[in-house]
Amino acid sequence: IILNSSTTDERREAYNCDITYVTNNELGFDYLRDNMVIYKEKLVLRDLHYCVIDEVDSVLIDEARTPLIISGQSGKSTELYKMCDYLARQMKRGEGDGEISKMDMLMKTEVEEDGDFLVNEKDKYVMLTANGVKMVEQFFHIDNLSDPENMEIQHNIILALRAHNLMFRDRDYVVKDDEVLIVDEFTGRIMPGRRFSDGLHQAIEAKENVKVKRESKTLATITFQNFFNMFDKKAGMTGTAQTEEEEFREIYGMDVVVIPTNRPIQRIDQPDSIFKTKKEKLNAIVEQINESYRKGQPVLVGTINIDASEELSHMLSKRKVPHKVLNAKFHELEAEIVADAGQKNAVTIATNMAGRGTDIKLGEGVAELGGLRIIGTERHESRRIDNQLRGRSGRQGDPGESKFYLSLEDDLMRLFGSERVMSVYDTLKIPEGEEIEHKTISNFVEKAQKKIEGNNFAIRKNLLEYDRVNNEQREIIYKERRRVLDGENMHEVILKMIKDDISAAVDQVCSSETAPEDWNQVELDDMIRNIVPFEEPVTLTEEEIRKADIKELKERLNNEALELYAEKEKEIDDPDQMREIERVILLKTIDRKWTDHIDDMDNLRQGIGLRSLGQRDPVVEYKFAGYDMFNDMTAAIREETVKLLYRIKVEQKIEREAVSYTHLRAHETLSDL
């Protein structure tokens, strides 16, 4: 078993067992850490052969859009977040319906509407109006917000507006001990250690007036989609996979097989009841809870966020109905609360966190009262989450019942066409406060959920298309890195790097299409001596200019560069020590350039959508641009490795552990040049 507290040695020992129990997060982070170590003996994982994933839909679908990230601190200031938060508080939200087109978003079009910004709650967009753009320009004393140098300001003001208008305390996050903690939208649990990316977390910290932590720099990252697809074989189990059958097959190549229940299901799933207003709905729910409580039947009430659970709790307290609340604020008490949820007279209010897979035992005499009663206060975007709530009752053949209570003011109904449902209300002339159970409305709710599920699947699929590009590059880098880590002699690789650097410099300056007398010898000298520290300037002989033989020129410069490197090697008595230095410097250079490349690819991804305006596929454009950037990165790794090795200074015989220190000395020397 691997725990969060397990040491490196304990992890290695556990992974070497035939069967290892580990959480998906620990496993993923161990993989990333293995690809950051400098010495082979620090590795913990074996090859990825076979995995069995518990609650497989939670891991491979719900968490598919959240990458695992190992990060370090960046040097970016946090002041801009505070300034944008101050400005966002002064800005007025427009009264428009917020239906901003995707084309407007891509073009960053200034929408002519009232107010300073518009919000599209369906797609979670915020957009400045013409008034808003002017307000930002005046506040920051800039002429044009759309200028490239002002992109950071534009990005941060949008983040601040999103934080205030789309991210809600006690729903999307909680504030605890002056820290903003993410609430998992699917489980309702706090996600310690996780942070919203792209500066959104900092914008929320500024909004909540807690310390704004510096933006982090990504050192290594991978999505669960790509990580688990690296296993030779994979399988999983869950009670709610059938609605996502297509995604399991398309993304993971996994078939979904429904296994019959151990005992027949006796739970009765009632049709939804729908009310006109949220107030009417909550009053009806409280009445139903009170009725069940009076006869002793236990009730589990599922809410979709903390606010809703606390509002319902307040109403029950006024009716003097004893109950327990289980949400992200009280998650420490989860096991105790869930254990008692099936007892006589128990009333439990829970966000989506009422323990996936938790077996709620029925107390004595409860089966005769009808078993555990499930009440859903709102439909979730995903039918799976609703099914999980229903599945808390009627386990192992126990009796039970479930029912959802909805209102036209619920988010799902409000954002996906409550006008159509309202027309049904008006046609049937339903009196105020009275519920309706109608097939048309139930079908509408299911269609809305299917539509959202389809949208979310498309988003995850699109994410995977982009991430495949990153994944191919990551696999190449990690494979090369492992070669170095395995102790392979890198000397020949280093010598080839020197030759390639010389060759690239000569090709850039001495083109066969240009007359030899026009070759810029000063530029050639600058480029080559920036890499190889020749004492004398690099010049061309009259004969080389006359013959214009680029191949011969490269050969001369290569030979001189290799002679200089051989002299550098003689400064270190032990050849094995030099091989170790080459290995460590190459590893550290790969790591540094790779982390910069991750940031560059992220920036490319942010702006790639604009290319679709030219009738070009943004994913294809991303692949081509990413390929060019990857080639630039490999050239930069080669160049910096050679620079460092030529300039390394060894003042005494060093042991293996001191190699990284030597590398730092070399790096400092280089930065001072």
PLM region spans:
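Conserved P-loop NTPase motor core
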Residues: 1-407, 412, 417-424
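Extended, charged helical/alpha-beta scaffold domains that provide interaction surfaces
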Residues: 173-181, 187-195, 396-397, 404, ...
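Generic leucine side-chain signal with a strong bias for well-ordered alpha-helical environments
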Residues: 316, 670-673
